[in-house]
Amino acid sequence: MMEDGVIRTARIKLKSKTRQKKKIAAAVYEYQADCDGEWGEIYFDFEKGRQKILWLADWDTTKSRIYAKRVIDFVLKQDSEELPKERLIAFEK
């Protein structure tokens, strides 16, 4: 259970990306909750506007998926042609 007001972090790494007609059509990001434990993966289909959590990182709960949701929000706000290779995302619960 997370306490309110505590700063949390999600580390992300671009695992792969697929191009179609010189544009990034899809990407897979690995993410790690609070820089600890096993990595999870999230698939982004930019052409169809869909995302899918392939598997949750350690410390990300099945019910809230707070870390995965923050990663999805962050990636969707980026220019799909300039996706970050690695980033540390900090957020407050």
Task: Please report, for each region that a protein language model flagged, where it lies by residue.
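Generic preference for well-ordered secondary structure
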Residues: 13, 26, 55-59
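Acidic, low-complexity intrinsically disordered segments
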Residues: 43-45, 49-93
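Short, basic/low-complexity N-terminal boundary segments at the transition from targeting/disordered tails
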Residues: 1-16
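Homeobox/homeodomain signature
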Residues: 2, 32-34, 79-81
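Intrinsically disordered, low-complexity regions
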Residues: 6, 38-41, 50
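Amphipathic, interaction-prone secondary-structure segments
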Residues: 14-44
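Short stretches within intrinsically disordered, low-complexity N-terminal or propeptide regions
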Residues: 12, 27-29, 70, 92
